[in-house]
Amino acid sequence: MRLGVNIDHVATIREARKTFEPSVLEAAFIAKRAGAHQITMHLREDRRHIKDEDVRLVRTSVEIPLNLEMAPTQEIKTIALEIKPQRVTLVPEKRQEVTTEGGLDILSNADYLKNYIKDFKENQIEVSFFIDPDLGQVEASKFTGADAIELHTGRFAESFHKRDFRLLEEEKNRLRKAATLARELGLNVYAGHGITYQNIHLILDLKGLIEELNIGHSIISNAVLFGLEKAITKMLGIIS
């Protein structure tokens, strides 16, 4: 199972002060050195964290596959076609949300999406849809022409956090059924959202069905905590 590292929240820390550090590019280099299989970045319409130049720099400077998460808008599409990431993952987007709250509704937007992704296909850019683990959405993704789906694991993660084990088992079964159908239809299957060091073992049970996990917040959170002592010691060393 591959790991895609989402570095959005490195930019979130930077944008909290509207400054130049921490460097998103350096974070991508670190992820590559650590063995990550892919860098994931979400270029949101409001540019709340990742900026256009961040994506350009990572794409041109780091020899690692880039997965660009994006809303299916014409503006972001133009940028994506210029940068040419190895993959685009289409996600729903609301300006008022803190993070992506659910999957893209392929069923209701199939005709639009089928036309929207043509340019990516012509440019040999893999197209993935971020969807809830719903069988109808999986089938619609195949019909629309996607190469892959990324299953939204948010409800699974929330039920784990709340220790709602009945709902947790239901969500895990939904993920299993959706992944199984997707594989039968010839789609690549990825997953992400809310996966942590504590709940990942349950997702690993689906290793034969899910090929890749995209994880960001949990990794960055742990990096802040476990790197804090080292950073303080380094500063004290300089002072002394």
Swiss-Prot record:
Residues at which 1-deoxy-D-xylulose 5-phosphate binds: 8-9, 44, 49, 99
Binding site for 3-amino-2-oxopropyl phosphate: 6, 17, 194, 216-217
Compartments (UniProt record): Cytoplasm
GO cellular component terms attached to this protein's record: cytosol
Signal peptide location: none
Pathway, per record: Cofactor biosynthesis; pyridoxine 5'-phosphate biosynthesis; pyridoxine 5'-phosphate from D-erythrose 4-phosphate: step 5/5
Catalytic activity annotation: 3-amino-2-oxopropyl phosphate + 1-deoxy-D-xylulose 5-phosphate = pyridoxine 5'-phosphate + phosphate + 2 H2O + H(+)
Classification via CDD domains: PNPsynthase
Top enzyme class: transferase
A biological process from GO: pyridoxine biosynthetic process
Keywords for the protein's UniProt record, in alphabetical order: Cytoplasm, Pyridoxine biosynthesis, Transferase
MF terms (GO), sorted A to Z: pyridoxine 5'-phosphate synthase activity
EC number: 2.6.99.2
Location of the active site: 42, 69, 193
Site positions per UniProt: Transition state stabilizer: 150
Role summary: Catalyzes the complicated ring closure reaction between the two acyclic compounds 1-deoxy-D-xylulose-5-phosphate (DXP) and 3-amino-2-oxopropyl phosphate (1-amino-acetone-3-phosphate or AAP) to form pyridoxine 5'-phosphate (PNP) and inorganic phosphate.
Complexes and interactors: Homooctamer; tetramer of dimers.
Stated family: Belongs to the PNP synthase family.
HAMAP family linked: PdxJ
Designated name of the protein: Pyridoxine 5'-phosphate synthase
Gene: pdxJ
